[in-house]
Amino acid sequence: MIYLRGLLSMQKIKWNIVWGIFITCAFFILLFIRLEFLHKNTQSVSPVQIIKSQKSQDTWMNIYQNGRKIGFVHRIFAKLEKNYHFNEIVFMQINTMGVTQALNILTEGDLNPDMSLSSFNFDLNSNLFRFNSHGNVVKNKLIFFMGLPGSQEKNEIQLKDIPHISGSIYDAAFQADLEKNISRNFSIFDPSTLSIKSIKVTRSSDEIIPIMGKRILTKKYCADFMGAKNCAWLSKEGDVLKETGILGLSMEKVSRQKAQEGIVNQGNIDLTQISSVASNVKITEPEKLEVIKIKVEGIGDLLSLNGGRQSYRHDVLTITREHLPPSANLNNKIPQDVALFLRSAPFMQSDNPQIKAQVNKIIASTDTAEQKARKIVNWVYRNIKKKPVLSVPNALEVLKNKVGDCNEHSILTVALLRSAGIPAQMEAGLVYLHGRFYWHAWNVLYLGGQWITADTVFNQIPADVTHIRLVRGDSVDQLNLMGVMGKIKLEVLEQTK
């Protein structure tokens, strides 16, 4: 997801302290693994074992990108008389498309005596945008509220087991006392995407590493999340001393004074650039191409390369530009399975009065489905300022602030189109610009009995064929991109106008 030609992209990373930067639109950062629940398929540690081993902690860590400090983490875990309290503050300065922005994240909560989750609060602030999620566990339900402060939506998730939470996945792995070369799956809950995912953690060989002027014997653990690898080094007491992730991100335990020292904000590497993929040829006027063939390497089996305008065989991806039938022959009869994509959804509030009111200003009741779609795409293109932002994309907030990168553009477009009676989804992958392919997000909408791509950053219906779809769906589905970040290679074989 990028911005380019004036466009930007930004990715969201949600990370429990460095576990990983996953880039989705200039894509940028937002905390990926936040709350971890030891779930049904996890061999959980008994409450007695956990209580005996847990102690109060006050830890500071620096966050680095290729050796340059870009932020810090302050984590407090307090053992109280009858329960526990955790608090984690993250501060980062992130460079996307040459723009450095500050990101502040707070995660805190209370734990019951048996270490099960009682309540939590997650708050993210960056420039114009703010996101909050808070809630508690009631019997077999996680009940929580998400969105803009003052106008939050209630959500519930059924839990098959009583959830537990630890400061990080590695704390849980340490408490499980994994033997060397043994793996275990842990389930995590991400409050910004309403999803529960599985992470595989493996105990590696012990290593001696330098930390705070000392050489310390550590236990090494590596986590695999959807193909992306992150490693951590823990002390014999279980303190996380160091973490490394993709795109040159790492964290290391330091003193409070060291953590609070200044951050280098000049010359930071642009993650949008380093996560992009080189092209072997120059593509001129991509909007005029009818067909493109690209050899694709370094991908897994979780991606959505086949279907619609894309055909993938023997490592070669063929993308053919769609063509709408003449308006007179355009029948927008919507099948039942497609009608699912007319529904309002978290962050895509198509039934909200503000969204409906904006749609009524954009379209006319006499417009055809195609006319409605083109008017909405054009309105988003002209009225949403193209600027990289650090946020949890939310259609209502984008409509209010009228600024954002490709994620913000595409999520607002989904809400507007659905409100206008046009089924719509998000797609994510790569798009060509100035000799490289950048991560990007756009839309797909149902017109004339077929799914048609649309890009409100470029004002295109259909989107040009250099848009390479890797996933289709919301931010949960976009997590599948983590496994190919830094691995995918592209070779353009043919271009046909």
Language-model regions, residue ranges each:
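Short, Lys/Arg-enriched N-terminal segments with co-localized hydrophobic residues
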Residues: 1-9
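Acidic/charged, solvent-exposed loop-and-adjacent secondary-structure segments enriched in E/D, K/R, S/T
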Residues: 148-167, 376
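Secondary-structure boundary elements
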Residues: 166, 330-404, 412, 474-476, ...
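Active-site rim recognition segments
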Residues: 252-265, 271-276, 333-335, 419-422, ...
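Cysteine-centered nucleophilic/redox motifs
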Residues: 376, 402-430, 443
